[in-house]
From Swiss-Prot:
One of its GO terms (molecular function) is ATP binding. Negatively regulates transcription of bacterial ribonucleotide reductase nrd genes and operons by binding to NrdR-boxes. This is Transcriptional repressor NrdR. It comes from the Bacteria. It comes from Marinobacter nauticus (strain ATCC 700491 / DSM 11845 / VT8) (Marinobacter aquaeolei). A zinc finger (unnamed) spans 3-34.
Length: 172
């Protein structure tokens, strides 16, 4: 690897460590010419499947677009960047592990909803309302009732969290 300081091609690895839960290798290097030290990160190049939109068009997987959608749903919610990054990594892992070269945008949306359901119920309902194009309040009620089933929350608890998010009480 070329030295970023002097451009010399001869460098040696001083230290290597696994980082990012073993998905990345951090290497500390030293230039044999100028003796400057620098750090590099090595990750496997994994190809993400192309996304097939509802109208049939195909486009490359765009992690930043996915992140922006999740961040929008989680706006003003008490979820850390680390939790968001972990959710993104799980989504990407599941998409890659299908072995398919293409994935429908609908499947991608369902993967996002699966992660948001675990991260934050308010964000989940926000995303679901846009993703499923809710037309009236009854669709919100039905989704809140589905969300509250099986996890001990009542529909009132989830609805209260949604309402409180718009007031000073619920802002994080």
């Amino acid at each position: 690897m070329h030295c970023p300081f002097c451009g010399e091609a001869d460098t040696k690895v001083i230290d290597s460590r696994l980082v990012a839960e073993g998905d990345q290798v951090r290497r500390r290097r030293e230039c044999l010419s100028c003796r400057e030290r620098f750090t590099t990160f090595e990750t496997a190049e994994l190809v993400m499947p192309r996304v097939v939109k509802q109208d049939g068009t195909r486009q490359p997987f765009d992690e930043e677009k996915l992140r922006a959608g999740i961040m929008k749903a989680l706006e003003k919610r008490p979820v850390s960047i680390e939790e968001i990054d972990a959710a993104l990594n799980r989504i990407k892992y599941r998409l890659r592990s299908t072995g398919e070269r293409e994935v429908k945008s609908m499947q991608l949306g369902e993967e996002v909803m699966t992660e948001l359901r675990q991260l934050d119920k308010v964000a989940y309902v926000r995303f679901a309302s846009v993703y499923r194009s809710f037309q009236d309040i009854n669709e919100f009620k039905e989704e809140i009732e589905r969300l509250s089933q099986g996890n001990g929350d009542t529909a009132v608890d989830v609805a209260r969290a949604l309402v409180d998010n718009g007031t000073d009480k619920g802002k994080a």
